[in-house]
Amino acid sequence: MAERLNAAAWTEIGLRVLADQGVEAVRVEPLARALGVTKGSFYWHFSDRRELLDSMLVHWKQLATHDVIETVERASDEPAERLRELTRLVFRHGGPLDRAVRAWASHDDAAANAIARVDAERYTFVRRLLEEHGLPAEVAARRAHLLYTSLVGEQHTSLRLSRKRRVDWALFNLESLLDLP
């Protein structure tokens, strides 16, 4: 495996460990053991742990924001259906990793800045979809805030519920926001 190992492999395992155990568990030696390589392999790709953590934030933003937006945009021509798909995708992919990045952001400026940029980008996307659905800009802005914070909150407060139940509730919230005058 070592001959095929690249920086992306380190970043991906770092994200898995982050989602499962938190940022403090993202350490070079345990990651190297998990990958079946020496620490030297790590330093071939990264100068230090901070560089790996920064790479993880970039990759997380791509996976959890850009890739999701691209998938949603391809899902339908109808803004309401794209919002439904976005809601489903949030619960299909986002939970543990997003929660871990938010926890990390509570004590790390780089992670906090990444969260702020991602939140702004996601909010703007939701607002645009609501405007395309026909809501006036000011109403769309307020409902985008409600919807986005609801989706983020659901990932933290309903952990004991089944994914299907959480998606059903989130879709109900979405439909309520779309139907209100």
For the regions a language model picked out, list residue spans one by one.
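Residues in soluble alpha-helical coiled-coils and helical-bundle/repeat scaffolds
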Residues: 47-51, 73, 77, 92, ...
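Amphipathic C-terminal alpha-helical segment
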Residues: 96, 100, 147-164, 176-181
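Helix-turn-helix
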Residues: 9, 13-51, 55
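Hydrophobic/aromatic residues within well-ordered alpha-helical segments
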Residues: 49, 56, 60-64, 75, ...
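Hydrophobic alpha-helical connector segments
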Residues: 55, 69-99, 147
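Generic hydrophobic, amphipathic alpha-helix propensity
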Residues: 3-17, 31, 56-60, 64, ...
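Solvent-exposed, amphipathic alpha-helical segments
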Residues: 13-21, 67-71, 101, 146, ...
